Amino acid sequence: MKRIEVWADLVCSWAHIGKRRLEQAEFDEDVEIVWRPYLIDPMAPATAGTFDAHRVVALALDRGGPALQDALVERIMHAYFVDGSDIGDRATLAALAAEAGLDGMAEALDAGEGTDEVRDQLLRGKAIGVTTSPTFVVGESAIAGAQSPEVLADLVRHAVPARELPDEVTRLRHAESLLDLRDPLGALRIMEPLLAEHGDDPSVRLLAARAYFGSAQLGRARETLESLLERTPGDHYARFLLGRTLERANRPVEALPHLRMAAAMSSEADYTDALRRVESRVS
């Protein structure tokens, strides 16, 4: 059975249309549909946003599986698009969940349940390149927008299977993607389990140092990099990043020897540019 992940905002009209087209698609094999969160306006206030609705949808998957989750998504979308209900209201969400067969949501929402899951999934979506509601993902293949039933069937038919990777590897890759997207705080959040369980691993520590540097946590970046370099003094990138950290902390004299060593070990342009810049400040 193939899994179709639908990344969508529940108040997106194209997501509503996409759901109908997904239901009309004729697949060659059994599929399961899993809904993932996407926020068209992540800065929307709680009274107008869909974050709580995404929490309930995530809890439905956790407690009742894809079928219950899909039934709840149907009720939420009907309530919003047909009945004009406020799906940012927790009492409304709890009632809709109960109609779908999921009880106890008022208490769950008040207790904060589902918050971490939704935040983690939002970061995962960002890391894998989701930028549109809806986006349909099957294995390593994806397509954005409310596509026709035929296109959705072709997506499932020709999807590249996802590689089975350890969770640690997946988190590292997602953290790297978030750093490339200039979201260092998101990268650190994704890395929390890695730092807790594999905090001594050099690759984990170096990635964390990059995230600390990117989020201007310069003291933590320096501490992490100095510890790394005690173990692996020949790591030219860690040496370069320590030099850059000290430069940003307005310590050019301390930065200079690290940048000189990094430039001596590797001729990368970033290294030589940083070295020239700091040398001009020190001279």
Label every model-predicted segment.
Residues 5-10, 16-79:
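Structural alpha/beta surface segment adjacent to cysteine/selenocysteine redox centers
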Residues 19-25, 75-192, 196, 272:
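C-terminal cap of thioredoxin/glutaredoxin-like
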Residues 169, 203, 237, 270-271:
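Start-of-helix register in tetratricopeptide repeats
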Residues 199, 233, 266-267:
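Short coil turns that delineate tetratricopeptide repeat
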